[in-house]
A protein has these predicted regions:
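Compositionally biased linear targeting/interaction segments
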Residues: 3-12, 22-32, 36-375
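Sec/Tat signal peptide C-region and signal peptidase I cleavage site
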Residues: 17-20
């Protein structure tokens, strides 16, 4: 009996050990799996928390940028109230070095100014009319409607040549601006091009769209029949210099070279002779060389132009021909400005640019558009 019992226990002992080992391994696997799942959930939660924090900090930075825009607008209005001339020596032209927000709040007596210690701001104001406005390439006349401005196109050709670029890029750029303006007419309006056939075709298309709207049946809610027909071929309207990449011949390298000297504003504008660089001034005056423009700017830095007559008198010293300054292209004040703001709040960094219009009569300002600055 003892021999038989001993043999049976010896046989059961390995099975019990194997069962305990399997249970231990299973427990370890379950524990490991649970730890992995929990760590994954915690990691996802941490990522979500960080994402929400980043969104909150970015939103706060954007709110600070709005304050910077309002502050700059106040400076622009104050400057216009004091002097009807826009020149580079004004308070508006002084850039803001990286400064803590708390420093500004403390100076004006804001309570709890120390809360802005983690927020830094910098930026400046740029005279948008110190550059060549590509919108000048197209003008509008009651008799002919929208058409390419040949004088502005020649100015752009000279600017391209002064910058070491091909002047052949000017005609396609002018044509592209014209095409985008003609295609950006809103619903219910017709582009008066001056061509009877074109206007009749536009009127017929408008009537067809009206019939489609009256039927109430459409596969594209919110879009007219004309929109559906042209949405794939309609060029994108220019709002930024980088949009020139859609024009044949304008490579990123060409655009990078052009960027400091050109801009795109909602309407044709004059060049401010008090703020424009020598390349822009020389391009706008066919008989003026780049060297002469640089010499003229040297005298301008000593005393700004008070009006076009003053600029004409001083310009005559640097020109061999009796070319006059056309008020269509030149002025000594500015109505459009770009406000650049860079806000650093905690981990968030926001770069924004606002285009501001200043009324020449009331000096009131309003923001035309705000966009993120392109790096």
């Amino acid at each position: 009996m003892m021999m038989r019992s001993t043999g049976r226990c010896a046989f059961c002992r390995p099975r019990a050990a194997r069962a305990r080992g399997a249970a231990l391994i299973t427990a370890l696997l379950v524990t490991t799996l649970a730890a992995v799942l929990v760590s994954g959930l915690l990691w996802r939660q941490q990522v979500e928390i960080r994402r929400v924090e980043n969104q909150r900090e970015a939103a706060q930075a954007r709110w600070v940028s709005r304050g910077v825009f309002d502050w700059a607008r106040l400076i622009l209005r104050t400057q216009a109230d004091a002097l009807p001339v826009t020149y580079l020596g004004g308070a508006w032209s002084v850039p803001i070095a990286p400064t803590r927000l708390s420093d500004f709040l403390g100076k004006i007596g804001i309570a709890r100014a120390e809360q802005g210690a983690s927020t830094w701001l910098s930026g400046g104001v740029v005279d948008a009319q110190s550059r060549f406005n590509l919108r000048n390439l197209v003008n509008s006349k009651p008799a002919t409607g929208l058409q390419v401005n040949p004088q502005a196109q020649m100015q752009f050709q000279k600017l391209l040549s002064l910058l070491g670029l091909s002047s052949d890029l000017a005609p396609p750029a002018a044509q592209y601006v014209l095409t985008t303006l003609l295609s950006s007419v809103t619903k219910g309006q017709q582009a008066q091009t001056g061509d009877v056939a074109s206007d009749a075709l536009a009127a017929a298309q408008s009537d067809g769209d009206a019939v489609s709207r009256e039927s109430g049946l459409t596969n594209t809610p919110g879009m007219s029949a004309g929109d559906v027909a042209t949405q794939m071929t309609r060029p994108i309207q220019l709002h930024d210099v980088d949009d020139l990449v859609a024009v044949p011949g304008f490579t990123p390298a060409v655009i990078a070279r052009l960027r400091p000297f050109v801009t795109i504003l909602p309407v044709p504008t004059q060049i401010n002779l008090n703020t424009a660089g020598p390349e822009v001034i020389a391009a706008a005056l066919p008989a003026l060389s780049l060297t002469a423009a640089q010499a003229m700017i040297t005298t301008r830095d000593q005393a700004f132009f008070i009006n076009l007559g003053d600029a004409q008198t001083r310009l005559a010293r640097f020109m061999t021909t009796g070319e006059t300054l056309d008020g269509q292209f030149f002025d000594v004040t500015t109505h459009y400005f770009e406000i650049h703001a860079r806000i650093t709040h905690e981990r968030a960094v926001v770069d924004r640019v606002a285009l501001v219009y200043r009324d020449p009569r009331t000096h009131s300002t309003r923001i035309i558009r705000v966009q993120d600055a392109r790096q």
